[in-house]
């Protein structure tokens, strides 16, 4: 399983164009197990986003153990608790969401 930060996807996709054989040799790419991670580091660390990313990763990596957790709902709870509001849908509209990624697309 590979998790990628959306802010680096342009570079990854550009590199994929130059080296597709490298990426296509990765088991996670072959098995469609490449997932997003919402950027939590810009000019400072955004703890709330890092926590939401951690729950999402846990849900992807351990689906049985986290089957009762909806990562989007959990992100909303975390954001609301730490920020006083839930910006997840704003992030989603801007292209930052929990999802599978196809490298090179």
What do the PLM-derived regions correspond to, one by one?
Residues 1-51, 65-67, 73, 77, ...:
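Binding-cleft/active-site segments that stabilize strongly anionic ligands or cofactors
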Residues 51-58:
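Extracytoplasmic/secreted envelope proteins and their assembly/folding machinery
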Residues 58-65:
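Short, hydrophobic alpha-helical segments
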């Amino acid at each position: 399983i590979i998790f990628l930060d959306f802010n680096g996807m342009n570079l990854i996709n550009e590199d994929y164009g130059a080296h597709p054989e490298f990426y296509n040799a990765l088991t996670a790419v072959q098995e469609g197990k490449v997932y997003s991670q919402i950027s939590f580091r810009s000019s400072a660390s955004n703890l709330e986003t890092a926590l939401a990313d951690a729950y999402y990763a846990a849900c992807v990596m351990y689906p049985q153990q986290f089957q009762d957790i909806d990562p989007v709902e959990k992100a909303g709870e975390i954001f609301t608790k730490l920020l006083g509001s839930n910006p997840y849908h704003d992030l989603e509209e801007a292209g930052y969401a929990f999802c599978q990624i196809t490298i090179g697309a």
